[in-house]
């Protein structure tokens, strides 16, 4: 791929050669990385996840060029001295390393291929990293379009939630050309503690979809277990403590418990506000369903989880965190 032989970081007259691997400890690698770090990085999508991710790039000394469809969310960055663009195309015109964090496949297609999209102004050799969770087939199509422009596309969806985004402890699942992984890793390590190369474009999305399907199933299971225990006379904090020292322990029980009052600093203790929305979980489960259909893979619990989250969206839970499944099971009595 011609794009893998391009230079990055030229915006300020500093060059970053991305087409040749170097030993991590070599002076050339250290100097190259240091120079590249002084060049602007584009960031598009400043929602619940994108906002803290962008802030962690700032903390690591990266100047940012930002865009969001809602201009108000850019104000605090502008006040901090960062550049705010009027469109994704303007971001691409000013930065040759761009990270996107968007809600859906449709949003990603618009940001990359729309009338004022990245591809209208993208420079040869640019590195485009999409951290949205979208259909793997859409990632592959975007990669083809980006390659035609002489640039490089990598999918790098994340896991860990808003808390990990704030603390810089996200897990990134990266798909794309392996020779470009080190260039992406440099940026992603500023926002995450785990950056894993998964394979070709689309494999990062596949890994994320599998993870979120399991997350939804485990959250429903945790909510059901907690609800059953509470109705059987157990104190919720005591039950959570027992689960978390037993074989039923999982992230949904020990880090993101869905029962109000059991844990501090989680959406369940804030009327299920913030966090990862029910609509987004339903979307991701739909992606898992599509992937299962195309690969002829049975996902019995995944399909049931998809039905439950779709029902929640229709019952007024769409804007609440996905852990509100506890409230849904407790109050709606769906079965």
From Swiss-Prot:
The modification N6-acetyllysine is found at residues 59, 75, 78, 120, 144, 148, 237, 241, 320. The modification N6-succinyllysine is found at residues 59, 75, 78, 94, 140, 148, 237, 241, 296, 320. SUPFAM superfamilies: 6-phosphogluconate dehydrogenase C-terminal domain-like (SSF48179), NAD(P)-binding Rossmann-fold domains (SSF51735). Keywords: Acetylation, Branched-chain amino acid catabolism, Mitochondrion, NAD, Oxidoreductase, Transit peptide. Homodimer. PANTHER family: 3-HYDROXYISOBUTYRATE DEHYDROGENASE, MITOCHONDRIAL, 3-HYDROXYISOBUTYRATE DEHYDROGENASE-RELATED. This is 3-hydroxyisobutyrate dehydrogenase, mitochondrial.
């Amino acid at each position: 791929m011609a794009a893998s032989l391009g230079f990055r970081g030229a915006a300020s007259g500093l060059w970053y050669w991305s087409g040749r691997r170097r030993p991590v400890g070599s002076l050339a690698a250290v100097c190259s990385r240091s120079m590249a770090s002084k060049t602007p990085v584009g960031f598009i999508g400043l929602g619940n996840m994108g906002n803290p991710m962008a802030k962690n790039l700032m903390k690591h000394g990266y100047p940012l060029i930002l865009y969001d469809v809602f201009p108000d969310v850019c104000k605090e960055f502008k006040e901090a001295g960062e550049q705010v663009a009027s469109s994704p195309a303007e971001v691409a015109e000013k930065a040759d390393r761009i990270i996107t964090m968007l809600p859906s496949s449709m949003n990603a297609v618009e940001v990359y291929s729309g009338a004022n999209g990245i591809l209208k102004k993208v420079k040869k050799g640019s590195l485009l990293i999409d951290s949205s969770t979208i259909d793997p087939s859409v990632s592959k199509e975007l990669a083809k379009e980006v390659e035609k422009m002489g640039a490089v596309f990598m999918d790098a969806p994340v896991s860990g939630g808003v808390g990990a985004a704030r603390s810089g402890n996200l897990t990134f699942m990266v798909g794309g050309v392996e020779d470009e992984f080190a260039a992406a890793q440099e940026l992603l390590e500023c926002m995450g503690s785990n950056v894993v190369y998964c394979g070709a474009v689309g494999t990062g999305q596949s890994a994320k979809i599998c993870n979120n399907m399991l997350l939804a199933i485990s959250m429903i299971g945790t909510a059901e277990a907690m609800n059953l225990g509470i109705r059987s006379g157990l104190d919720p904090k005591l039950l959570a403590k027992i689960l978390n020292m037993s074989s039923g322990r999982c992230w949904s029980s020990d880090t993101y418990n869905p029962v109000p009052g059991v844990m501090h600093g989680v959406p369940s203790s804030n009327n299920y506000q913030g966090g990862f929305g029910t609509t987004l979980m339903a979307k991701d489960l739909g992606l898992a369903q599509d992937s299962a259909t195309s690969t002829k893979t049975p996902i019995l619990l995944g399909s049931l989880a998809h039905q439950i989250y779709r029902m929640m969206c229709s019952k007024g839970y769409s804007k609440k965190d996905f852990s509100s499944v506890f409230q849904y099971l407790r109050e709606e009595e769906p079965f």
